[in-house]
Every structure is written in C-alpha cells, then in structure tokens.
Amino acid sequence: MKVVSVNVGLPREVVWKGMTVQTAIFKEPVAGAVAIRDLNLVGDEQADLTVHGGADKAVYAYPAEHYEFWRRELPDLTFSWGQFGENLTTEGLMEDTLHIGDRLRVGSATLMVTQPRMPCYKLALRFGRDDMIKLFLASGRSGFYFSVIEPGSVAASSEIEVLSRDPNCVSVADIARLYFGPSSDQ
C-alpha cells in the first residue's frame, strides 16, 4: 500500500451557475514531502469550515484504483490525481477493507479512518456536471477521511502501513451504504 500522489489546494472564487462561490476542491499534485498537521496538509485549506475540514476530516484520501472506473464512466473527461478533491491518492486501500477507527502509518504520520466522503455540490462544480453527486454516490466509491493522530510528512510513493484494526470492523463502505443506500431495507 502506498501514496500515489499528494494533492493540495487553496480556496478560490469560481463562477458556477451564475453565482460566485468559494471552493478549495481544485487540488494539484505536489512534488516532494508535505507536512501533515492536525487539521490539514501544509499548502491545503478548506473554503467552508462549516461543512469541510475539522479534526475528523483533516485529510481526504481517494483510491487510485477508482480512476479507471471513472475514465470508463465519463470518457469525455481528462482525469488527473486530485480530481476528486483528495489530499492523498492511494493504492491498495479500499472502502470495503478499511474500518472506521483503523490506524495507519502514512509516510511518517499516524492517521485514523473516520468516515466516508459525503459530497456537496462542489463535486458537481468540479466536474461541470449536475449529475456528478448522484453518479458518485451510486458508484460506492466514496473515498475516506482521516483524523491526524500524530503529525508527520508524506510524499508520493510513501508507504502506508496498517498499525491497528478497529475491533468493531465497520467498514467505510458499510457506513456509506447506510447513508446512501436504498432506504427500504436499512
């Protein structure tokens, strides 16, 4: 398991549907090591702290494995790491095998899995598609948030190691299904 890309971005104003909105969903890959702090990565911020960021959403990761699905699903788009607003594009970590509460060593930082991503309208803005949130939720490819247990640094190609598994064994995918799955059987 490893980090494929480290991506950061700062808030900026974007015109969308005739409105000017602040967003930091536009992340760009960076070279070299980046410090992971308690609430974010150096060079990265969230635009709306009422719904983004905070201790339980300090770092957002998205599996590189999902990009091939999206290339097939949306063939007219060109994809680059960070496209989903993730700080870490990872390899070998998936929603169905990561549990809420699992602790991982990512580079020199210790992170804990906290929750799946629950996208806001800015994902639709990022992709220029009104149906993007619906597609994202239906795909089951949510990615996952981490809290920072021990700050450190991370770079593309940093190793990822599972330090401990939460004994409750509730996966990120389980939580995403509870939030976004069909409500008749939940």
Model-identified regions with their sequence ranges:
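Electropositive, beta-rich accessory/interaction domains or terminal extensions
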Residues: M1-K122, D131, P167-Q186
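Short loop/turn positions at the edges of beta-strands in beta-sheet-rich folds
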Residues: G92-M94, G140, E150
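Loop/turn positions that initiate beta-strands
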Residues: G101, P151, A155-S158
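Active-site glycine-rich loop that binds ribose-phosphate moieties when present
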Residues: F127-K134, A138-V148
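Short amphipathic alpha-helix initiation/capping segments at coil-to-helix junctions
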Residues: A138, E150-S153, N168
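Short hydrophobic beta/alpha edge segments that flank linear recognition/processing sites
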Residues: I160-S164
